[in-house]
Design a protein with these regions (language model features):
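A short alpha-helical cap/connector motif
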Residues: 1-151, 158-179, 183-248
Length: 248
């Protein structure tokens, strides 16, 4: 039985726990619609996967981020890419398709999504370019080589970004780029903690620690990008980045 044969039960389970703040864009709705409809659309298997994800309520990067990543990959042509958070493999396949000479390592712990990703990598014949590592990111990251990756994309548990960051910074090359997705949390990050729902405060606190560690840190060049639910972009400027003694 293929992964798609058991799709309904898998998707229902995943969707209950997925982060849906990407549906609360911080940019004006009409501008979001403009970016999603006027920029070049996906074709072929990427269009198929994007439509499947939308139909089944599986979070993948929205189309304005797709267009941005398409530009980044074609311009930077990174040789080694690391992704934390595979889901169904859409973003890994997008990066692979637009940087054909890259080698991509992607990490995920969710067995349901791993099943989809494996099938998609095989179905679209990207198994030689994309390596999927199964397990907890904090267990896997220390086993990967340091100063190796040109580009790292983090799209996993937002409260854990600050926990993963010290290891991730070891893995990226000096001059390399790290992008962290969904960091505005629908605008919550700009609020006082007393205005945040209790169930969201762990994420809020984790993101505030992330901002404290990076936004004014000379060891990295940081930029917040108001695209979808926000991107944090980091360029590693020196080999040993000091995260300002932030308690991890």
């Amino acid at each position: 039985m293929s992964a798609y044969d058991i799709m309904d039960s898998m998707v229902e389970s995943y969707s209950k726990n997925a982060n849906h703040n990407m549906r609360r864009p911080v940019v004006k709705e009409e501008i979001v619609d403009f970016m999603r409809t006027r920029q070049a659309q996906n074709t072929g298997f990427l269009k198929e996967l994007e439509e499947f994800a939308h139909q089944e309520n599986i979070p993948v990067i929205p189309h304005e981020t797709v267009a941005y990543f398409r530009l980044l990959m074609q311009t930077l042509q990174p040789k080694r890419i690391l992704e934390v958070g595979t889901a169904i493999g859409f973003s890994a396949l997008l990066m692979a398709d637009n940087s054909p000479h890259s080698k991509i390592t992607t990490i995920d712990r969710n067995e349901e999504m791993i099943g989809f990703a494996k099938e998609n990598f095989a179905k679209y014949d990207y198994r030689q370019q994309i390596e999927l590592l199964e397990g907890e990111a904090m267990d896997i990251l220390p086993t990967l080589p340091d100063n190796t990756y040109d580009f790292i994309f983090m799209d996993s548990a937002k409260s854990k970004y600050i926990v993963f960051l010290p290891e991730v910074l070891k893995k990226v090359k000096v001059g390399g780029l790290i992008i962290l997705d969904d960091i505005f949390q629908g605008g919550d990050v700009a609020k006082d903690i007393k205005d945040i729902r209790r169930g969201q405060r762990t994420i809020y606190k984790g993101l505030q620690r992330l901002f404290d560690a990076t936004l004014d840190n000379p060891d990295v060049t940081a930029s917040l990008v108001s695209m979808s639910d926000g991107l944090l972009m980091l360029r590693k400027n020196i080999e040993n980045v000091d995260l300002k003694h932030i308690e991890i």
